[in-house]
Design a protein with these regions (language model features):
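Acceptor/aglycone-binding surface of glycosyltransferases and processive sugar-polymer synthases
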Residues: 71-89, 94, 106-182, 186, ...
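Short, well-formed alpha-helical segments that are part of the catalytic scaffolds
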Residues: 23-38
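Short beta-strand/loop segment that forms part of the nucleotide-sugar
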Residues: 35, 43-53, 71-73
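A conserved acidic beta->alpha catalytic loop
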Residues: 51-59, 102
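Donor nucleotide-sugar binding loop of glycosyltransferases
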Residues: 23-27, 54, 105
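Structural signature of beta-strand start/N-cap positions in the alpha/beta core
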Residues: 15, 44-46, 69, 120
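Hydrophobic helical membrane-anchoring modules
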Residues: 1-12, 183-307
């Protein structure tokens, strides 16, 4: 039988981090569901609940619940800030991220933790899209996911699922990079993949959320895209600078040959020279950025999981 720890005085197997923002109507139901599942598992665990400045009485409700570790923000700071604070306060060898809005199969958390064996992160890949603003979210998420796959060179079935488990000792070196909003889940996925850590995907059912969605389709989609581009420049800048420099150098070389053949004399026009010079400049910047990126990662000493 599992043991739940609420004091944070000693380490546990699993820390479940729950960001809360105006979820009073279904808060207890979700916490009861998680508790029932974990009590039936072999894992000792803790519930780290972060109230993100709720205004509907969620914090008052949480203060009446025994057996949880509660962190509360005075003002709303965003899902990423809540997850970061909860993860930093965690003591578990494994950290689970999920939501309490009835969308994720929280009774499957023990199975999610079990799937982590031999991997550094396990992500619940949603098999359907039940979120709001589908007309905008579906194509935007497809494009951003393809961009992330280009960076990492790895197939990513679901880039921004909020249902995941990971090794805390690996994740802690990237917590400072998490943005305050929803794109924190994208960031933690790409940080693991870009640095050679193993990420496994398991299919999950995804349900319509209870209560009001906090996702703003334009603002949060823009932030997702910005975060992916930021990750590209931080971890694999040659993915951008390499192709761009090749296009410039290739175009410049073809034009140089054409100029020589067309005019029967070796004289480099200004526009041709500009193409070649710009191509070399872009390539040089890319190589320098790549060296800096690799140097910055040498201090990371957490070994990937082994089978």
């Amino acid at each position: 039988m599992a043991e739940r720890v609420s004091s944070g005085d000693r380490a546990v197997d699993v820390s479940i981090v729950l960001p809360i923002y105006n979820e009073r109507g279904h808060l207890r139901q979700e916490l009861d569901r998680i508790t029932l599942a974990m009590d039936s598992s072999p894992y000792s665990y803790e519930l780290v609940v972060v109230d993100d400045g709720s205004t509907d009485g969620s914090l008052d409700e949480l203060r009446q619940i025994d057996g949880i570790r509660l962190i509360s923000f005075v003002h709303n700071r965003g899902s990423g800030s809540a997850r970061r604070a909860g993860t930093r306060a965690s003591t578990g060898r494994v950290v689970v991220w999920t939501d309490v809005d009835m969308t994720y199969p929280n009774d499957d958390i023990p199975q999610l933790v079990k799937e982590l064996e031999g991997h550094d992160q396990v992500v619940g890949a949603r098999t359907s899209e039940e979120g709001t603003h589908k007309f905008a979210r579906v194509p935007a998420k497809w494009f951003i996911r393809r961009l992330a796959m280009y960076l990492t060179g790895v197939r990513i079935p679901d880039l921004n699922s909020g249902f995941r488990a990971f090794r805390r000792n690996v994740a802690k070196q990237y917590l400072h990079m998490l943005p305050p909003g929803f794109s924190c889940v994208t960031t933690i996925t790409m940080c693991f993949l870009a640095n050679g850590y193993s990420v496994k995907y398991v299919p999950i059912e995804y349900h319509e959320r209870a209560g009001e969605s906090k996702f703003h389709w334009y603002r949060d989609t823009r932030r997702y895209l910005q975060q992916v581009v930021r990750m590209i420049f931080m971890y694999n800048p040659m993915r951008v600078f390499g192709p761009l420099s090749l296009v410039l150098l290739g175009t410049g070389f073809v034009k140089l040959v054409w100029d020589i053949v067309d005019k029967s004399q070796f004289r480099v026009p200004v526009n041709t020279a500009l193409l070649l010079f710009t191509g070399f400049q872009v390539l040089s910047i890319g190589l320098l950025a790549d060296v800096m990126s690799r140097s910055g990662r040498q201090s990371q000493d957490q070994e990937p999981a082994t089978r």
